[in-house]
C-alpha cells in the first residue's frame, strides 16, 4: 500500500516536472534502455519488499508478537524530499481546519507514573473501564497491518508501548488507516486509552484517541536495534561506549543537542548527573552555613586568575569591560564586609584554546571561608568529593576510559584521604633538579630554561619563570596523578593571591587537586596583607610587560578592600565541567556541555 502510494506520488511529481519549463528532450536509444532497466529494477525491488512485508506480517500474526520496526517507505527517500513532503502534508491538514499545533492537551499521568501504576498487571490483562491520557514523542513505529500498529512513546526518558488497534479506536476503519499513515517517528502526540499488557507481557496503552500535538518535520535518526526494549540504564561511575549510540556523529550531536537528547537515551542521564553534581555541591555548602551569592560577570579589570579575557564595550559609559575570568576578588570583598562564608556557582569566560578539557565558557564553584586555612580545605575537599562519588555511584571507585573507548577503562579511587605531594620537593626528586631558592632571579629563570631543554619540555614564549615551572610540573608531576592527588605548597611566583607559607620561605599555602592528570580543584590560604598583595600585583605587571597577557592586572579596588581587613580566610575553586567528565566517563568536555563552543559551519 505504502509503496504504491509512494510510486504514484513520484509519477505525479514527474508529470508536474515535465509539464513546466523547457520542452523535454528526446532520449537516445541507450538512454531509453537505461531508463527501462532502472524502472524494471525498481519494480523488482518493490515486489520483493512487498513479499518480505507479507511474510513478516504472517510470521508475527502466527506468533502473536508485534512486528519488528522496519524503515517506512518515505524514510528511504532523500531527507530534503521527506521534509518537503511533510510540509505539504501539514499544509493540507491545516486546509481542512485541523490545527496540528493545539494549545493544550490534558495529560493526567506521566509515562513514568503510568509504568509504576500498572507494571504489576498480568499478561493479557486489560482495564477497559479505565481511561488514562499520556503525552510524549513517538520514537518507533511498527505496523502489523493497516489496522494494527505499535508505537514506542517516550516521555521524560521513559517508554511505553502504544497498541493501536482499529477495533478499539473511536475512528472508522478508513479514518483510522488514513490517520495512522500520517503519524511519523518524532511526532509529539497525546494518547487517551486504557491500560493493559500485551500477550508478550509488554505494558501498553490501548488508544481510543490519538492527537497530534506537534509534528516532527525532519527524518529522525533510526534506532540501531530493531527491538523496542529500553537499553540498560547508564549510571554515574560506569563506562560508556558512544559507538553504540543511535546518533554518533559528533558534529550533529553537539550542534543539534536536542536531537542528541531525543535519540540517545544515555545522554539524558549524563546531563541529569551533571545537575546532581551541582545540587550536591550546593546542598553540601548550604549545610555548612555558606551563603550563595552572585557577583558581576562584566568587570573593568580582568582579575582573580591568570588568563586571557574576552573584551566587550559599554556604549552608554563608553568604556571597555571584560567578561569575568573568576569571581574571586568580589567574593573576598564580601568576606571583608562580614559575610564569613560565601560561594558562587556560575560561568567564567577565558579567551583561550578549545580542546578536550577546555571550553571558552565554563562553570565553576568558588567559596571563601573565614577563619580557615588550606589544611581545613584539604579535609573539606576530601569529604565533599568522596561523599559525592559515594552518593552518585554507591561506592568510591569509578570507571574511566582515559586512553579511549577502544581500550579497557582505568579505575579511579576516591577513597579518602587523598594522596599529597609537595610541588618543589617532588619535582626536584623526579627530575633530579636543584632549583634556586630565589625564583624571582634571572639565575632561576635560566636554570629552568635549561631544565626544559634537557627534558624536551616545550614552553612557548614568553618563557617566564612561572610558565617554565608550570610546564615542568605538568610533565613530571601531573602525569602521576591518576587517583585524586593534592599538589601542595606552590612557589609565591606562581600564586599571586595566595598567602606565604608559614614555615617555608618562598612558598605559599596552596594546593591543586588533580584527578586523571587534570586539575579539578585549586585552593589556598588567602593573602590578606594589602602591602604584600600590591607587591605581588606589581610583579605580575612585569610578566605582562614581558608579553604574558595572562598575567594578572593590578586591581586598586580590591587592594583598598584589603586595607579594611580580610580575616584569615581559605579560598577554594572547583571546575564542575571536568568533575562531571570524570563521573560520566566523558573524554571530551563537549560531552558534558549542553551547548559547547563550535566553529562556524561552512
Curated annotation (Swiss-Prot):
Its EC number is 6.1.1.6. It holds the Pfam family tRNA-synt_2. Residues 1-78 are annotated as: Disordered. GO terms for biological process: lysyl-tRNA aminoacylation. It is found in: Cytoplasm. Keywords: Aminoacyl-tRNA synthetase, ATP-binding, Cytoplasm, Ligase, Nucleotide-binding, Protein biosynthesis. Its main location: cytoplasm. PANTHER family: LYSINE--TRNA LIGASE, LYSYL-TRNA SYNTHETASE. HAMAP family: Lys_tRNA_synth_class2 (MF_00252). This is Lysine--tRNA ligase. The lineage of its organism: Eukaryota, Viridiplantae, Streptophyta, Embryophyta, Tracheophyta.
Amino acid at each position: 500500500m505504502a509503496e504504491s502510494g509512494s510510486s504514484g506520488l513520484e509519477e505525479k511529481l514527474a508529470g508536474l516536472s515535465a509539464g513546466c519549463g523547457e520542452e523535454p528532450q528526446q532520449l537516445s536509444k541507450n538512454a531509453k534502455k537505461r531508463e527501462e532497466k532502472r524502472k524494471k529494477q525498481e519494480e523488482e525491488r518493490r515486489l520483493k519488499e512487498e513479499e518480505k512485508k507479507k511474510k513478516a506480517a504472517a510470521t508475527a500474526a502466527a506468533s502473536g508478537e508485534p512486528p519488528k520496526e522496519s524503515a517506512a517507505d518515505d524514510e528511504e527517500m532523500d531527507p530534503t524530499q521527506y521534509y518537503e513532503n511533510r510540509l505539504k502534508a501539514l499544509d493540507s491538514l491545516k486546509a481542512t481546519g485541523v490545527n496540528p499545533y493545539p494549545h493544550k492537551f490534558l495529560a493526567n499521568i506521566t509515562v513514568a507514573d503510568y509504568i509504576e501504576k500498572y507494571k504489576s498487571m498480568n499478561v493479557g490483562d486489560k482495564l477497559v473501564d479505565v481511561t488514562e491520557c499520556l503525552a510524549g514523542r513517538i520514537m518507533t513505529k511498527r505496523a502489523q497491518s493497516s489496522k494494527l500498529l505499535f508505537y514506542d512513546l517516550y516521555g521524560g526518558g521513559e517508554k511505553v508501548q502504544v497498541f493501536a488497534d482499529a477495533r478499539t479506536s473511536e475512528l472508522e476503519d478508513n479514518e483510522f488507516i488514513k490517520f495512522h499513515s500520517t503519524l511519523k517517528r518524532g511526532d509529539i502526540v497525546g494518547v487517551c486509552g486504557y491500560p493493559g499488557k500485551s500477550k508478550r507481557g509488554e505494558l501498553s496503552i490501548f488508544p481510543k484517541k490519538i492527537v497530534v500535538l506537534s509534528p516532527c518535520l525532519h527524518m529522525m535518526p533510526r534506532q540501531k536495534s530493531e527491538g523496542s526494549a529500553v537499553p540498560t540504564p547508564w549510571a554515574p561511575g560506569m563506562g560508556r561506549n558512544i559507538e553504540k549510540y543511535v546518533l554518533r556523529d559528533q558534529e550533529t550531536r553537539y550542534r543539534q543537542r536536542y536531537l542528541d537528547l531525543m535519540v540517545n537515551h544515555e545522554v539524558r542521564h549524563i546531563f541529569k548527573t551533571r545537575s546532581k553534581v551541582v545540587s550536591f555541591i550546593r546542598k553540601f555548602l548550604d549545610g555548612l552555613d555558606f551563603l550563595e551569592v552572585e557577583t558581576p560577570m562584566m568587570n573593568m579589570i580582568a582579575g582573580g586568575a591568570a588568563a586571557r579575557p574576552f573584551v566587550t564595550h559599554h556604549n552608554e559609559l563608553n568604556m571597555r569591560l571584560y567578561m569575568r575570568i573568576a569571581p574571586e576578588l568580589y567574593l573576598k570583598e564580601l568576606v571583608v564586609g562580614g559575610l564569613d562564608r560565601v560561594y558562587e556557582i556560575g560561568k567564567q569566560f577565558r579567551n583561550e584554546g578549545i580542546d578536550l578539557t577546555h571550553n571558552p565558557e565554563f562553570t565553576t564553584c568558588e567559596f571563601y571561608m573565614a577563619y580557615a586555612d588550606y589544611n581545613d580545605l584539604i579535609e573539606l575537599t576530601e569529604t565533599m568529593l568522596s561523599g559525592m562519588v559515594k552518593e552518585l555511584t554507591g561506592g568510591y571507585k569509578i570507571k574511566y576510559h582515559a586512553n579511549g573507548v577502544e581500550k579497557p577503562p582505568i579505575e579511579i579511587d576516591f577513597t579518602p584521604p587523598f594522596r599529597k605531594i609537595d610541588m618543589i620537593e617532588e619535582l626536584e626528586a623526579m627530575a633530579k633538579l636543584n632549583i634556586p631558592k630565589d625564583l624571582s632571579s634571572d639565575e632561576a629563570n635560566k636554570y629552568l630554561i635549561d631544565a626544559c631543554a634537557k627534558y624536551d619540555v616545550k614552553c612557548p614564549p614568553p618563557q617566564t619563570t612561572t610558565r617554565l615551572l608550570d610546564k615542568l610540573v605538568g610533565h613530571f608531576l601531573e602525569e602521576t596523578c591518576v587517583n585524586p592527588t593534592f599538589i601542595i605548597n606552590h612557589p609565591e611566583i606562581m600564586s599571586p593571591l595566595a598567602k606565604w607559607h608559614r614555615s617555608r620561605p618562598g612558598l605559599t599555602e596552596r594546593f591543586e587537586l588533580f584527578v586523571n592528570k587534570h586539575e579539578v580543584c585549586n585552593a589556598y590560604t588567602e593573602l590578606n596583607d594589602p602591602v604584600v598583595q600590591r607587591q605581588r600585583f606589581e610583579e605580575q605587571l612585569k610578566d605582562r610587560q614581558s608579553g604574558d597577557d595572562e598575567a594578572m592586572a593590578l586591581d586598586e579596588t580590591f587592594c583598598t578592600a584589603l586595607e579594611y581587613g580580610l580575616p584569615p580566610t581559605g579560598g577554594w575553586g572547583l571546575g564542575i565541567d571536568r568533575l562531571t567528565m570524570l563521573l560520566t566517563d566523558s573524554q571530551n568536555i563537549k560531552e558534558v556541555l549542553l551547548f559547547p563552543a563550535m566553529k562556524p559551519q561552512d
